[in-house]
């Protein structure tokens, strides 16, 4: 039996923008302007480049299985806000990922809170790989502005 990698463990939305996520907080699909429209995002991977006191660099993929990680995911009561808590056991780093869609805006917002619970001094740089769905008509695109990535569809 094959594993269904597109199983939604959580869904957030506002009636126009709908986002499906897995249990680790990875975005599986994003729909706009209706929940049954084609998905706008093909894949998004978030990683953190970490430098420690010994100048060794490491990569921690937040939604990956590279390190032994405990996950806990829950909605903030009576909201469309989803919090995914991640604790990387052998690195003593905790990450809170917050996803939400404002009720009157056509956007998905994601925020990270990172806490170093070890005695080592570390420097963290976020990294993002993002792919958008497109076709021969090139109707989807993206741009970076003020520490944010914006995906958009020309025809909507």
Language model: regions and residue ranges:
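Terminal accessory carbohydrate-recognition/targeting modules of carbohydrate-active enzymes
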Residues: 1-156
């Amino acid at each position: 039996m094959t594993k269904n990698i597109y199983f939604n463990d959580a869904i957030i939305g506002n009636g126009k923008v709908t986002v499906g996520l897995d249990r680790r907080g990875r975005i599986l699909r994003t729909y706009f302007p209706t929940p049954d429209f084609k998905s706008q995002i093909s894949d998004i991977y978030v990683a953190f480049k970490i430098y420690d006191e010994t100048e060794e660099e490491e990569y921690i993929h937040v939604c990956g299985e590279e390190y032994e990680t405990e996950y806990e995911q829950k909605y903030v009561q009576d909201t469309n806000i989803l919090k995914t808590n991640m604790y990387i056991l052998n690195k003593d780093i905790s990450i809170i990922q917050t996803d939400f869609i404002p009720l009157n805006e056509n956007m998905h917002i994601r925020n990270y809170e990172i806490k170093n619970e070890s005695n080592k001094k570390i420097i963290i740089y976020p990294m993002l790989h993002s792919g958008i769905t497109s076709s021969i008509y090139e109707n989807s695109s993206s741009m970076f502005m003020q520490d944010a990535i914006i995906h958009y569809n020309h025809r909507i």
